[in-house]
Amino acid sequence: MAAKPPLTLYLAAPRGFCAGVDRAIKIVEMALEKWGAPVYVRHEIVHNKFVVDGLRDKGAVFVEELEECPDDRPVIFSAHGVPKSVPAAAEARQMVYVDATCPLVSKVHIEAQRHAEAGLQMIMIGHKGHPETVGTMGQLPEGEVLLVETVEDVAQVEVRDPERLAFVTQTTLSVDDTKDIVAALQARFPAIVGPHKEDICYATTNRQEAVKEVAPKADALLVVGAPNSSNSRRLVEVGAKNGCSYAQLVQRAENIDWRALEGIQSIAITAGASAPELLVNEVIDAFRDRYEVTVELVETAVERVEFKVPRVLRTA
């Protein structure tokens, strides 16, 4: 049998689950323990098919709208956050609901409301249609929050009063792209108020920093994550921008395009914030089957963040 070719595998850290995702999954599991199945979940709890399928097997029912849920079963709101109208509708129907919105997203919601109460018009930097953007914009009446996605959008945006503006951002954006958009906003509207640093969360920032470290070392980068995961897609972009000629998103090992990887001597691997470590290990094992793998851990930060689950699930 021919000897396997050698391969250096740079494993980025931090990678995978963040504290908000961990908490959201725990909320669904604890709700199923407390109330039994079915427990309804509005929108995928986190953007990962493997996680969602696992929870579905345990009795979670995933729906897109509250109207699809019966009044007499608990409903959980996803980690991405929801517009204010959603809990209001649940209360009107006297439903039991648990909000699994990531606390770092909730912080952005509070910020947006605080600025609006101070009479400032809100601008949101985010991706149109992403559930987090929809949720944050939905903290204020329709039309009150202006969305910008690119530097080009900043030139087009029409505001009521350039002296009375504030901005917030989606938590899962590219750190570098967002800096450029913020700079464009500040150049056009010098009086604009924003957070001390962008609202991009610690986990998004850390995962992008780790990719910047591994991307130039490797012939290729694989990001384990789902196609609808904003933070995972940003990791692919960051890899491509930082010197990695082949950067690809894979949901799991079976999605690896081996032909595209022919002749590589090194690979970098990371995972989006909603991808379980199990899927990363599956990808590493697939490389071990084909190569003589030497794993090098590249760690750029250590994360110790933990979020408590809501009180309703902590009590018997």
From Swiss-Prot:
Pathway: Isoprenoid biosynthesis; dimethylallyl diphosphate biosynthesis; dimethylallyl diphosphate from (2E)-4-hydroxy-3-methylbutenyl diphosphate: step 1/1; Isoprenoid biosynthesis; isopentenyl diphosphate biosynthesis via DXP pathway; isopentenyl diphosphate from 1-deoxy-D-xylulose 5-phosphate: step 6/6. [4Fe-4S] cluster binds at C18, C102, C201. It comes from the Bacteria. (2E)-4-hydroxy-3-methylbut-2-enyl diphosphate binds at H47, H80, H130, T171, S229, S230, N231, S274. One of its GO terms (biological process) is terpenoid biosynthetic process. It catalyses: isopentenyl diphosphate + 2 oxidized [2Fe-2S]-[ferredoxin] + H2O = (2E)-4-hydroxy-3-methylbut-2-enyl diphosphate + 2 reduced [2Fe-2S]-[ferredoxin] + 2 H(+); dimethylallyl diphosphate + 2 oxidized [2Fe-2S]-[ferredoxin] + H2O = (2E)-4-hydroxy-3-methylbut-2-enyl diphosphate + 2 reduced [2Fe-2S]-[ferredoxin] + 2 H(+). Its cofactor is [4Fe-4S] cluster. It holds the Pfam family LYTB. Dimethylallyl diphosphate binds at H47, H80, H130, S229, S230, N231, S274. The keyword Iron applies. Binds 1 [4Fe-4S] cluster per subunit. Keywords: 4Fe-4S, Iron, Iron-sulfur, Isoprene biosynthesis, Metal-binding, Oxidoreductase. The active site is at E132. Belongs to the IspH family. HAMAP family: IspH. Catalyzes the conversion of 1-hydroxy-2-methyl-2-(E)-butenyl 4-diphosphate (HMBPP) into a mixture of isopentenyl diphosphate (IPP) and dimethylallyl diphosphate (DMAPP). Acts in the terminal step of the DOXP/MEP pathway for isoprenoid precursor biosynthesis. This is 4-hydroxy-3-methylbut-2-enyl diphosphate reductase. The lineage of its organism: Bacteria, Pseudomonadati, Pseudomonadota, Alphaproteobacteria, Rhodobacterales.
